[in-house]
Amino acid sequence: DLVNYPLVKGESRPVRLFNRDSNEAFYVLQTGLAGPAGDSSAHPTHLATFAADAPRYDLANGSDELRVPLTWTDAASGVTVTKTFIFRRGQYRIDLEYTVKNAGAAPWSAAPYMQILRDDVVLERSMFNVETYAFKGPAYFDGTKYQKLKVEDAAKEPLARDVQGGWIAGMQHHFVSAVVPSGDAPYRYTMKVDGRQYLLTTAGPMRSVAPGATETLKETLFVGPKLQAQLEKAGPELDRVADYGKLTLLAKPLFWLLEQAHKLTGNWGWSIILITALLKLIFYPLSEASGKSMAKMRVLGPRIKNLQDTYKDDREKLGKAMMELYQREKINPLAGCLPIVIQMPVFFAFYWVLLESVEMRQAPFLAWIQDLSSKDPFFVLPIIMAGAMFVQYKLNPTPADPVQAKVFMILPLVMSVTFAFFPSGLVLYYTVNTMLTIAQQWNINRRIEAGRTGRD
């Protein structure tokens, strides 16, 4: 149980990653040492029985590390294996240490393995449920490439490859269980599918322990929220499980900026506002070009209306007359599009940062918004957003096409209804961005109209 992460804010029931007993989806992480093929002697697999020295282990006050040793002994071979889980305060990384002591008369061999066995629950994607947008399923990293796996594909072509310096993971929105094998030798990565259940395994090379010798094997687990600072330290590029999709290259630095803003403000909501303003400032030269084009089009509004009235029955002549007007006034009606297109990947990347980052989960902002990852309970932000979009529409030139003009009129209402079910952090970002755009466009319109009046 992740006791610091309630399933529902304000309730005591925590998020539970693994499940083997209830009626919910089966999900376990298994570790052990397996014997050579054909060897019928006992080995400490995940099915073996281990003994604990105490019925309960607690992290003592003033201590930052808790070691939980479990012991397996095979009288026939004279081998004792101590399997120690090492927990650290405030960390979701778990170090796994095997100490193999061979007191027998013959060499003893075993290979370490770790595996994730999980039911694949198919979620029907819904625009009103952001949980369905995040990837949920198996993934691995081969030292170079990060790969998300589809269960249906693995059923047709099972995964089987040798990897050194990688990891495997079972992913879901905001949380992950990951296995990071020792990087000192290649491990065999496999995935098998039985119905809707998958088994993702990493198996190491066979290790031999001579009579009278003691050997130690070390592996790493990570079980918990996708806290990127901790993920980076737990395994090579393990922070990739904070999955921003194809916009990762842009999203990573944006998340870093958001973290720095949070260090200043101590509040993720104010951090969103601060970074939104920073992005607006960075892109001001580009958005100013777009704004100037729209402002000039707005000034020409009455003249365009006259042309529409004059050539209302001849669309060909209307188009020609409008192009001549644009040429005389040195206006390119498409000039404002390119700056917007250039900015879109950055804003979509920021969207994914807010959607995927566990730091936003149940993070409070203001009085009525106590969870930036959930919808606004009173729909205040969507209403403000709709009002801001309407003001923005009024600042822009009226479309020549009456149908298009009506579409733009009702767009704020449509967007507010849609965003009413989105996480309030996303709505906050969009609302602040719209309000900053209004301020910028109003200032540009004022300057363009003042310059026009001076010439007239």
Residue ranges with predicted function:
Residues D1-R240:
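Soluble non-transmembrane domains of integral membrane proteins
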Residues Y98, A111-P112, L117-E131, D194-Y198, ...:
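Helix-loop-helix
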